[in-house]
Amino acid sequence: MVKKISRNGSSGKRESILRAATRVFARNGYFNSKVADIARAADVADGTVYLYFKSKEEILHSIFDQNMAEAITSGRKLIKALSDPREKLRRIARLHLERLGADRDLAVVFQVELRGSTKFMEEFSAAGFAEYLDLLCKIFEEGQRSRVFRKDLNAKVVSKILFGALDEMATNWIISHRNYKLEPMADVVMEVFLNGVSAE
């Protein structure tokens, strides 16, 4: 059982361990990484890591949970004052790629390491990922009610299509040998998503 630590002075060390783990997982791969590697990168003893996390798997979960929560909170704040559902989706799309583009190690963990097994995918799909898709879905449903978006489309499917497009942009950015900024790709995705590819 993990020892409970008071909040006073503990959050900084926990954050340091998570940042170190993100670097280690991105560079070595999750399955090739050890808690000792994370401790070394965080400049703490192995036992210190176990004061905050039960296992390497819990560390990976914590990286996901924390970053998804931050993305969802930031997204909701970003669109709070907006009324146009199209602009809301544009802002969320930019934020999605901006966050990943600002931290390549985090992007590698999200796009590659979290997908290393079916078990991980099932667990993470049931967690913050579902809440993120729900945010997209609710914006699209808002647009359907205001007749901005087509009413004959399934909002849940549409939200997955949008996420999938952004997700592929992030994955391609990671594996590409070209040096370019990721965030502007959100505008390309949204142009196609909102206006389609047919010439009319």
Locate the predicted segments by residue.
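Short hydrophobic/aromatic patch on the recognition helix
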Residues: D43-F53
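Amphipathic alpha-helical packing segments from all-alpha helical-bundle domains
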Residues: A69-T73, F120-S146, K156-K160, G164, ...
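Amphipathic alpha-helical segments used for helix-helix packing
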Residues: L100-F120, N172-I175
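Amphipathic C-terminal alpha-helical segment
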Residues: E98-A102, K138, E142, L162-Y180, ...
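Alpha-helical DNA-contacting segments of helix-turn-helix folds
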Residues: L60-N67
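Hydrophobic alpha-helical connector segments
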Residues: S62, R76-D105, A155, S159-L162, ...
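Basic, helix-initiating cap at the start of DNA-binding domains
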Residues: M1-N28, S33-A41, E58
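Short, hydrophobic secondary-structure boundary micro-motifs
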Residues: V108-F110, E123, K151-L153, L182
